[in-house]
Amino acid sequence: MPPISRGFHGRREDDADADRLPPGQYLTPDFPVLSAGPTPHTPLDEWSLTIHGAVDEAVSWTWDELRALPSETFTVDIHCVTKWSKLDTTWTGVSVDTLLEGVATEAEYVTAWSDGDYTTNLPLEDISDGKAWVAYEYEGEPLDPEHGGPARLVVPHLYFWKLSLIHI
């Protein structure tokens, strides 16, 4: 019996891009929507981002305050934990380094909370020194709630799973 059922051909990536894919990932031209729960739709006038916990003093930004911070546009490959990859995606957002300026902490790890109480833990070194952004635009357009809007944590060297960010 063949290892692959008849009619199933699998997914083949372009050989030119194969070296950009982690093992087991497949390329997609799409931006799949995969969620474990309902999609939050927080009105922008009610949204805020807060850094709190093991810090000397919590800091928060409203939507307008976040958008007023210096932003960067960056192009990265994204690789989702659900095995899809999309290459050369362009985002705009605020560097986590900008958000951490003036935040005194001895923490080595952070927890990122999404709207809806999903959390993920990360070493602080994975989101500092130019390695992560709080992105609010994708391909020049506001980030849709279905893709983590209004703002999501983008950490290009880690798998893509940090949606709809509200706390760090």
Enumerate the predicted regions with their spans.
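Structured, non-membrane catalytic/scaffold regions adjacent to prosthetic-group chemistry
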Residues: P2-H167
